[in-house]
Amino acid sequence: MQRIQLNITGMSCSCCAPNGWNNLPNKLSDFSTLVNSATRVAAINLSEVTQTAEVCEAVRRAALCTDGGEALQRRQADADNARYLLIRLAVAAALFVPLAHLSVMFAVLPSTHFPGWEWMLTALAIPVVTWAAWPFHRVAIHNARYHGASMETLISTGITAATIWSLYTVFGHHQSTEHRGVWRALLGSDAIYFEVAAGITVFVLAGKYYTARAKSHASIALLALAALSAKDAAVLQPDGSEMVIPANELNEQQRFVVRPGQTIAADGLVIDGSATVSMSPITGEAKPVRVNPGAQVIGGTVVLNGRLIVEAAAVGDETQLAGMVRLVEQAQQQNANAQRLADRIASVFVPCVFAVAALTAVGWLIAGSGPDRVFSAAIAVLVIACPCALGLATPTAMMVASGRGAQLGILLKGHESFEATRAVDTVVFDKTGTLTTGQLKVSAVTAAPGWQANEVLQMAATVESASEHAVALAIAASTTHREPVANFRAVPGHGVSGTVAERAVRVGKPSWIASRCNSTTLVTARRNAELRGETAVFVEIDGEQCGVIAVADAVKASAADAVAALHDRGFRTALLTGDNPASAAAVASRIGIDEVIADILPEDKVDVIEQLRDRGHVVAMVGDGINDGPALARADLGMAIGRGTDVAIGAADIILVRDNLDVVPITLDLAAATMRTIKFNMVWAFGYNIAAIPIAAAGLLNPLVAGAAMAFSSFFVVSNSLRLRNFGAILSCGTSRHRTVKRWRCPPPTRLRSTACSPVDASPLRPVAHRTGVKPPTHR
């Protein structure tokens, strides 16, 4: 399968989406599409036999006006469309004002008629109902061609009918017999309907313009994110000179120079120089970071002072910035469950509105009303219905939220990320690399009697050098002289073994090596390390327990505040780790986590998540390592630290770009605020149509008022979604448990399960039995 994206510029609401696709040639039926009415982008999955060019040409023949350009270039179409509508709106409004005044005057005071007044009104109205209203007529014609209908069909029909009726009443000298005087004008029973046709055009164009402008604002976050990339790079030549090239021509392993005020052109490794780098464009963190040789840097960040020589490791579409843009776009293109329901309703909405309009006309005729009242009520029904509000209720909120999340360092992969947060009551944290910095260091080496500490450390470091586990890397980095290792084997969740200088060496957990340790020295060293919250690693050489290596990992400064913020919001927290219970309990006590689940094998983390879910909890998991991948996938909501492994990032629903736990409560707040916005939009969209159509059918609304109400409805939905752009403006999660947590304007997420704090739920989980499952390679 191959995936392409097309810009559907001729689509305005959910009703438009199925029309073209349902009428494409049968030979192109071997593809599936996902069309988003807010972004107007169709994601098409093609089979191998289907040619991309065939699909594009078929869609163009269906008059869907495709554009296969870059996705970010397509975002500019919203701004261009807003300018296009503004021109038509300005001309229509300039003609509508005198037209409305003259029409009311001629209707209320027939004595003001003068020779040629009919032609004056016609001259003012025709440009409005034809040229200015052409965007509606064009889509309506397309829909009629393919036996479909949309909001534009309703508007075009209303404008056309009002224009034809106006020509008949003006040139046929039709006189109304109802509602004489000024009340006739207010109640919409005038014999002149030019101002109605023009007024509908003006109000709907105004709504379309403001909606298009708001939608272009909704994409600003994504455009700003893409604009962070550097335009050029100063590549270092072998002779020491520099050559400036476009950043998109930079290749991996090329070295480039970055000076103060310049943007780093690609992800890479600092080879030479020191500088302070602003990470805020990518991670949202305001505090600059000091980088030195050997540090990794991210493309799109800005050097504040100092000079760096960077070796490119990821360029072009492989950079972290490009990946962020792709994730945000993918999130914006997906349709939530609520939106799929709205789309199904919208697909039958327009035919139902036509039926209601026809029944309204028949009903008023049976009641003995005159043609003016019949016509006014039917037109009001047509123009007041707003399927557009239904189509925009969810995708606009998700589009704004995903863009705002990217600015805050939160990448949401799709609508599941939003929907899963509604019932989350428990947040489970991994320890190493998540709650702690992951930068482990050897803090102490204790040798058994008859052994030397240097010898123990060197033998252990030699074996650990073949593993990529965080503890192994720390031990391996503690010494530079290492012998070759043979027969290396990693036992996930336990440790490693190998042969060094013909001596069998095992390094790993006390439970694996020293289940029965008779050395008082080693037992004391282990106890002291665990009381300090450090990890104790035993070393065995030729079957003899010869030493204990204590590895320390600093707790992140943001961990305690983040956990306190979660507690203030009503969430329960748990620590899930393969470390020993004493060390895990020390870390949990320092941070304030409710529950500790320690000494867990990597494959058993999934079982722990399942146990929590079986007890009625809705679980969010935060992790960063390879062995966290299955648990992140099993949890109701998986959050991966951005600097984590590809496995963790791939399994998670949300990626936290910042290496800062303050973003965890912010993420849950953003998702909850987004779901509240979507719910409010849906209530408004359904409520408006349910209430407005009967009022219009009852003849209580002038068609002008109906057109204005319809335009306002869709504009209201988009504007309400745009409120999410300000999310986090007054949010401060960097709070201690002794300070009041400032939240966004909306209330915090509520606990949906009262059993969360019951005595049964508060009891710790027993470590689950080992079971066969996912075995992460060389990790414990």
Curated annotation (Swiss-Prot):
It holds the Pfam family E1-E2_ATPase. Involved in copper export. The gene is ctpA. This is Copper-exporting P-type ATPase. Keywords: ATP-binding, Cell membrane, Copper, Copper transport, Ion transport, Membrane, Metal-binding, Nucleotide-binding, Phosphoprotein, Translocase, Transmembrane, Transmembrane helix, Transport. It catalyses: Cu(+)(in) + ATP + H2O = Cu(+)(out) + ADP + phosphate + H(+). The chain crosses the membrane at residues 89-109, 114-134, 153-173, 185-205, 348-368, 374-394, 680-698, 704-722. Residues 2-67 form the HMA domain. PROSITE patterns: ATPASE_E1_E2 (PS00154), HMA_1 (PS01047), HMA_2 (PS50846). Cu(+) binds at C13, C16.
